[in-house]
């Protein structure tokens, strides 16, 4: 994602002393408003990159006036819940306290970015205002994002460098044991040991919880109590680098909760273990919410026994909290449970189940919904250590390996599988057992020693004295036991970002691999991507087989009318991915660089840099794990053309490097013995044309001339001025215009006439025309489409318009016609539909594509 900043030259050196704010700044303000997520970005010293700049930010107040300081306004603001995937927060320090702010107030703050607004919080990014007039209240009662669970010994890279969540200044939540309580004096609080090492007694890795006597915060905790604490994550490093010294500052007494009878915990908290693998909270009664990963009656004939896991989350739509699983085990089956049932369970934690996992003995069990999606499997290796596997207990996992032993008689039936990380699956070391029961309805029939299998199920461990025994996999569905010999087909699905149709078979360009795949397969000469022709929307389509109108990702960003703000996307689409559809059939999926499949169906994922590294990672994944579906992204053609154009030596070199990388990947399939069963799908997400005229200022001139108040969502992310009626978002080759307020017919007619009169505008699409193109409502009320050679951009080459919607698409495989040109119109959504058909994987209802019968023999 491009993060464009206009960082100005004036630097303010802030002087800190106890109880005193930094001096005022004369720094020139940054234009428009700044996203809190971007404000949270640090330099290598742990300080905000915008240090010393004057910014305007919008956020939600997390703590009322007077709680953190009794003489000035000192509080934190955070991004609202609807944008938590791009979460950020900052402290606000404003002279005086005549104006009072409440939790949930939506405020716009203008001030100088400083490193700590209070002596004890040095290292925490803050905004210092000149006066209370620099804080404007724009609403109240706004919901805050839920506190995010962290360990009390967080690493800097975990809490400040995550690409989607930066926790300094944000609400966090810790669980642990209390020590060193300070109940008197001005500074009060205690320490909590909830460190990742599982030793809650030694005080190593503990975190301070701190407040002041005037705050009104009360606490009844004592030494040795188990507590859950919610508050704002602060930093108190005295000097550079500001990468440690984290503590929690609560905003109210409700943020300090003793774990007593039936306390509600997250599953990831309830399953905390001691160093010996036993339940940390053993003997305590708690309440948890989750989803049944399997039915009752399958793991035990007469007792309640199943795994309960965290609800499956959609990254970008839901806050992505740490997941966990519990082994629910109790005498009798008072309440039958089916896979996918949403549950609320109250019971006692321990290690009392049939297996050695942390267990919950239920006193009450309530089914609140049915047919809910179950947490996706995490791919593991059979030789992973207990430390690597401990956090995955009772959650869905997937292994692939060679069968070294079988026991298919008696009540307990097993496979022993060697899927070790070293790739040697024949030496019998680093194996893991797969268990089913004779009464479970699951069968191992037909499996033989020496063959490869893919097994999905719950990660369990043998019962026994602490430290508890070996891990094994317990399947919950027959589809979770797959013989690789029954799935010989392999598919290489290559995503080519900004790949023009004419990049192959150009004179003097050396692309023998592309040429061979085209001549040995079918090239679709009338293939089209989604409109607008932007990467985020089209890559989402390539990963889901859904039109933008179905997956609701219109572009990189859009204007959200409901919340009056600009919203950006990463993975926020609530439809199944091709990886998830393959996974539902027990098949293995790998992805290289395609982040839209990361945690969304890719069992194996690798992030890469250069093209050579992409090829190397793909080759290693094919040779070692051999996924049924491999998705590889090459984004270099897009970035190179933006900078250098579509015809020079730079783009030629990149295309030839990708050609060479494809050759290496295909050779890996040959080494694996898949040459005869390999399917290859090559597809671009959009085209690319060179730009000779930038229309950005022309668009502004036209909007000025029409006289309708407007704002640019790229400059001001919202909230917007009260009189603003139009908000526009630039997408390079197009501009999306949103009606923030209704227009009169005269205004509408003048706007259309003005936009259509711009030289270089090919067309202005109205909402009814956009509906007919399968686009979502959040794309805009109007879209201004540039003619070829024109764009709202200064890049050498661009996309985003209808002129770049045609795409490169090739199918190659044992059932595909050879040397054919498929001239019937087809769409990028068809790629997933055809990949599913070749593998016999059922398509979800959200797949909009069609099987292209004309490309098959």
Enumerate the predicted regions with their spans.
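Bacterial N-terminal signal peptides
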Residues: 10-19
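Sec-dependent signal peptide cleavage junction
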Residues: 18-29
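OB-fold single-stranded nucleic acid-binding module
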Residues: 28-485
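Metal-dependent active-site segment of extracytoplasmic phospho-/sulfohydrolases and closely related
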Residues: 493, 513, 657-699, 776, ...
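Active-site nucleophile/metal-coordination loop of metallo-enzymes that catalyze phosphate/sulfate
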Residues: 500-584, 600-602
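A long, amphipathic alpha-helix that forms part
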Residues: 612-622, 630, 638-678, 749-760, ...
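Acidic/histidine-rich catalytic neighborhood
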Residues: 677, 687-736
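Active-site neighborhoods of enzymes that stabilize oxyanions during catalysis
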Residues: 719-834
